[in-house]
Amino acid sequence: MPVGVPKVPFRLPGEEDASWVDLYNRLYRQRLLFLGQDVNNEISNQIMGLMVYLSIEDGTKDQYLFINSPGGSVIPGVGLFDTMQFVSPDVHTICIGLAASMGSFILVGGEITKRLAFPHARVMIHQPASSFSKGKTGEFVLESTELLNLRETITKVYVQRTGKPLWVISEDLERDVFMSAPEAQAHGIVDLVAV
């Protein structure tokens, strides 16, 4: 029997009676957001919408994005990263479990000094990948050009946000690089390891 999303009581300010809302909606009201799956258009759009809404509602209260993601699509992930930079509140990023591939890119996008990993979390970085189409040669060339542009963008972001030199990041992105939370801190991807 599936459990589903639990319901919790929530009372709006000024109301006497609490209503029952699902757990995630209750946490959203506290500005606690979750990325707990592959990065795709649907989840990215949902989180971006929440970030913008919460920013409009109160641009002074920080937002907290908890990440446990194996990665996913590059374009939706870059869109989420850009939204984090755009909204006026600081966005804290917290790695719980795994932040791999696009998950680590979103993790590094948190407000500098406000990026955290739990002690047993794992972080993995690598270059963007593509399943090259079996189409015509011209399509292959266009796709590979776009992939190189994306790699350059991702590399620049890691360089800027980690403080590591370009050659270190470029070398790291050549393969899958797994890190413990302290290693991710030493690498500049997170600022703190929770205790």
UniProtKB/Swiss-Prot annotation:
A biological process from GO: proteolysis
UniProt entry keywords in alphabetical sequence: Chloroplast, Hydrolase, Plastid, Protease, Serine protease
GO MF terms held by the record: ATP-dependent peptidase activity; serine-type endopeptidase activity
PROSITE patterns recorded: CLP_PROTEASE_HIS (PS00382), CLP_PROTEASE_SER (PS00381)
Cell location: Plastid, Chloroplast stroma
Chemical reaction(s) catalysed: Hydrolysis of proteins to small peptides in the presence of ATP and magnesium. alpha-casein is the usual test substrate. In the absence of ATP, only oligopeptides shorter than five residues are hydrolyzed (such as succinyl-Leu-Tyr-|-NHMec, and Leu-Tyr-Leu-|-Tyr-Trp, in which cleavage of the -Tyr-|-Leu- and -Tyr-|-Trp bonds also occurs)
EC number(s) on file: 3.4.21.92
Pfam family, one: CLP_protease
InterPro entries noted in UniProt: ClpP, ClpP/crotonase-like_dom_sf, ClpP/TepA, ClpP_His_AS, ClpP_Ser_AS
PANTHER family listed in its UniProt record: ATP-DEPENDENT CLP PROTEASE PROTEOLYTIC SUBUNIT, CHLOROPLASTIC ATP-DEPENDENT CLP PROTEASE PROTEOLYTIC SUBUNIT 1
Function: Cleaves peptides in various proteins in a process that requires ATP hydrolysis. Has a chymotrypsin-like activity. Plays a major role in the degradation of misfolded proteins.
Subunit structure: Component of the chloroplastic Clp protease core complex.
HAMAP family: ClpP (MF_00444)
Protein name listed in UniProt: ATP-dependent Clp protease proteolytic subunit
Gene behind this protein: clpP
